[in-house]
Amino acid sequence: DTAQTANWRTDPAVAAGGYFEDLASHGLDLMLHLLGDITLAQGIRTNQQGLYAAADAVTGTWQFASGATGSGYWNFGAAQALDAVTIHGSQGEIHFSVFGEQPVVLRNAQGTQSHEIAHAENIQFFHIENMQKHMDGLVTHPSTSHTAQRTTWVMEQISRPPF
């Protein structure tokens, strides 16, 4: 964000972690859902652009309980917006976007498969509807206070000062 306009996401009094606090939780929550608990996380955050008070660049590294490692980089002042996740495995890789309507691409020894997953027009509606069904005991929703706490812990570890 290089607009230099007042924005709750860039005001540390409202959102201490800036855009990272608002947006990174979604991708990190998805990583926890797909790959399991993260047991170690650390990071670096800084304000490179000086356009607002919150950090605009964050780098994080983490380790899953399985031993797999991961890393992420969020730069909210970059010239080009990029929303991409790549999971590299011993037999191939999967590539997808957290927010964008990009195809999910699987590459392995058998070739490349690409799948379009259209976003619902009102994605929050289905999330809220399924949370209500969860609270009524009708279904088990994958997003709970426990998963939110895990994601928050990872973000706090990435965001905290190194010393």
PLM feature spans:
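C-terminal helix-rich "cap/oligomerization" subdomain common to oxidoreductases
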Residues: 65, 131-163
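Predominantly a Rossmann-like dinucleotide-binding segment in NAD(P)-dependent oxidoreductases
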Residues: 1-44, 48-51
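A generic structural signal for residues located within well-ordered alpha-helices
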Residues: 23-26, 123-126, 146, 150
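NAD(P)-dinucleotide binding in Rossmann-like oxidoreductases
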Residues: 48-55, 65-129
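Acidic/polar loop patches that form or flank catalytic/metal-binding clefts of enzymes
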Residues: 37-43, 69-71, 94-95, 141
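Anionic-ligand binding region
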Residues: 43, 57-58
